[in-house]
From Swiss-Prot:
Keyword Lipoprotein assigned: yes
InterPro entries the UniProt entry points to: Glucanosyltransferase, Glycoside_hydrolase_SF, X8
Protein name as it appears in the record: pH-responsive protein 2
Gene Ontology cellular component annotations, sorted alphabetically: cell surface; extracellular vesicle; fungal-type cell wall; hyphal cell wall; plasma membrane; side of membrane; yeast-form cell wall
Induction and repression of expression: Repressed at pH values above 6 and progressively induced at more acidic pH values.
Protein's membrane topology: Lipid-anchor; GPI-anchor
Keywords: Cell membrane, Disulfide bond, Glycoprotein, GPI-anchor, Lipoprotein, Membrane, Signal
Gene Ontology biological process: fungal-type cell wall (1->3)-beta-D-glucan biosynthetic process; fungal-type cell wall organization
Signal peptide range in chain numbering: 1-22
Localization: Cell membrane
SS bond partners: C72-C101, C214-C347, C232-C263, C369-C420, C378-C444, C397-C402
Propeptide boundaries: 516-544
Family recorded in the similarity comment: Belongs to the glycosyl hydrolase 72 family.
Length: 544
């Protein structure tokens, strides 16, 4: 009876050990302007599909595509069937668990490029900022996904600058890239690439790519995606504009790929551009592309339709399948590419079409902002709704100089407190107004929206406040803090781990590494299985 009850447990344990011990996908690395597998140095081309369903039936602002294992189980076979090796996801809910979907994707050999923003937390092209709220959002996604080796990279922005009148917004996205890369490094995570996804505006596209690729490695984008919809119906390399784009980007210096493609002006889409994209004319410059998109919706870009949780492939799916399965791109080796003549891109000069400063916004620093807030006498009252902040800003900044909280991506001039939370910035200008009105009690009221507090300045804050100056027009060099994001429930490993993001940084310093918890689990279960098998052998039920 003992052996009967023990034997299934032994088999289960050994099966689980086999599952946990399975190799993670090798991380994808960058050398020159190409992607390579980290384990063997062979070139990696993106054969991707955008995978995010619009929110139709929920009060939430978006649907997390990797938080529903049943949907992943339903869809991944259809992704596999068309040789998909990358999906792009546009918004992730950091309060959800993604372990099962990420594991299923890994088992299918599929990598993920994830946008760091979400609809309610992104850089606004019309009023751009890079502040603590966004920094905490971006780093929370990094914390959640850093230890999955099938995370290929992150997008810090998508079509933020989309025409010549808002090129200043790119300075804020580039600051986001800089600080996200610094955060990854400071946490000891593996080196995950961070890039940008642009639209295809002929007036700015070359300057846009050059801007993100130029400068010091610490602040430059690691890769560049372009949402390309020029090839419609039966076109050609020249007629589609692909030839022109390839010439435009041939010296970019970082990997470039189509972060979206698949014009639907002619349907069904036959995807005749696939052979060209992965052909010899384009592969020296381009690293593949991501078809837009998996789900059929009102915009008519889908490869499949889903009704009552049942997948039906569309004609586009069949055409894409036949094209993507027939590609044979040439393959470079990382060892040869390292000796390439491709060098760092030169930053674009300011013109009528391009006005983004190479002087980037300061790093959001929670400690600096907290020091400033504590030093104030007049602050916004806690009962004031954040929706009312804009009216208060408008009123105050019409009466005093608010440059200490403002940021200008064209001139490259940024107030010392421009990266702070809105509440802290509002308190700062309220206090300025109060001081400029000789600290009259009525000057700290604003219709009951402000109140007085006892100002405090800790010794550790003196240097910050001195550098910023009383008006906030000085310069404070913010520091990337590693304690801003909350712990999450995801395992953070391609091969299930029980450690949270807050405790796993030391176990993920190299590509493809298992988390400490996974290693412990494997070792423990191996010992259990070994003991169990020894017992069975000892009873003579198995001969060795």
């Amino acid at each position: 009876m003992l052996l009967k009850s023990l034997f299934p447990s032994i088999l289960a344990a050994t099966s689980f050990v086999s599952s946990v011990a399975a190799e993670d996908l090798p991380a994808i690395e960058i050398v020159g302007n190409k992607f390579f597998y980290s384990n063997n140095g062979s070139q990696f081309y993106i054969k991707g599909i955008a995978y995010q369903q619009n929110n139709l039936d929920s009060n939430e602002s978006f649907v997390d595509p990797l938080a529903n294992p049943e949907h992943c189980k339903r869809d991944i076979p259809y992704l596999e069937a068309v040789d998909t090796n990358v999906i792009r996801v546009y918004a992730l809910d950091t309060s959800q668990d993604h372990t099962e979907c990420m594991q299923m994707l890994q088992d299918a050999g599929i990598y993920v490029i994830a946008d760091l923003s979400q609809p309610d937390e992104s850089i606004n092209r019309d009023d751009p900022s890079w502040d603590l709220d966004l920094f905490e959002r971006y780093t929370s996604v990094v914390d959640l996904f850093h230890n999955y080796t099938n995370i290929l990279g992150f997008f810090a922005g998508n079509e933020v600058t989309n025409k010549k009148s808002n090129t200043d917004a790119s300075a804020f996205v580039k600051a986001a890239i800089r600080d996200t890369k610094a955060y990854i490094k400071s946490k000891g995570y593996r080196s995950i690439p961070v890039g940008y996804s642009a639209n295809d505006d002929s007036a700015i596209r070359v300057s846009l790519a050059d801007y993100f690729a130029c400068g010091d490695e610490d602040e430059a984008a690691d890769f560049f995606g372009i949402n390309m919809y020029e090839w419609c119906g039966d076109s050609s390399y020249k007629a589609s504009g692909y030839e022109s784009a390839t010439n435009d980007y041939k010296n970019l210096g970082i990997p470039i790929f189509f972060s979206e493609y698949g014009c639907n002006e002619v349907r069904p889409r036959k995807f005749t551009e696939v052979a060209t994209l992965f052909g010899d004319q384009m592969t020296p410059v381009w690293s593949g592309g991501i078809v837009y998109m998996y789900f059929e919706e009102e915009n008519n870009y889908g490869l499949v339709s889903i009704k009552d949780n049942t997948v039906s492939t569309l004609k586009d799916y069949s055409y894409y399948s036949s094209e993507i399965k027939d590609i044979h791109p040439s393959s470079a080796k990382a060892s040869a590419e390292s000796a390439s003549s491709i060098s760092r891109t030169t930053c674009p000069t300011n013109t009528n079409n391009w006005e983004a400063s190479t002087n980037l916004p300061p790093t959001p620093d929670k400690e600096v902002c907290e020091c400033m807030s504590a030093s104030l006498k007049c602050v916004v009252d806690d009962k004031v709704d954040s929706d009312d902040y804009s009216d208060l800003f408008s009123y105050i900044c019409a009466k005093i100089d608010c440059d200490g909280i403002n940021a200008n991506g064209t001139t490259g001039e940024y107030g010392a407190y421009s990266p702070c939370h809105s509440k802290d910035k509002l308190s700062f200008v309220m206090n300025l107004y109060y001081e400029q009105n000789k600290e009259s009690k009525s000057a700290c009221d604003f219709g009951g929206s402000a109140s007085l507090q006892s100002a405090k300045t800790a010794s550790s804050c003196s240097a910050y406040l001195s550098s910023a100056g009383s008006s906030g027009l000085g310069t404070v060099s913010g520091t990337v803090r590693t304690d801003t994001s909350q712990s999450t429930s995801d395992s953070g490993s391609g091969s299930s781990s029980s450690s949270s993001s807050s405790s796993s940084s030391s176990s993920s310093g190299s590509s493809g590494s298992k988390s400490a918890a996974s290693i412990v689990s494997v070792n423990l279960l191996t010992k259990i299985a070994t003991i169990g098998i020894s017992i069975v052998v000892g009873f003579g039920l198995i001969t060795m």
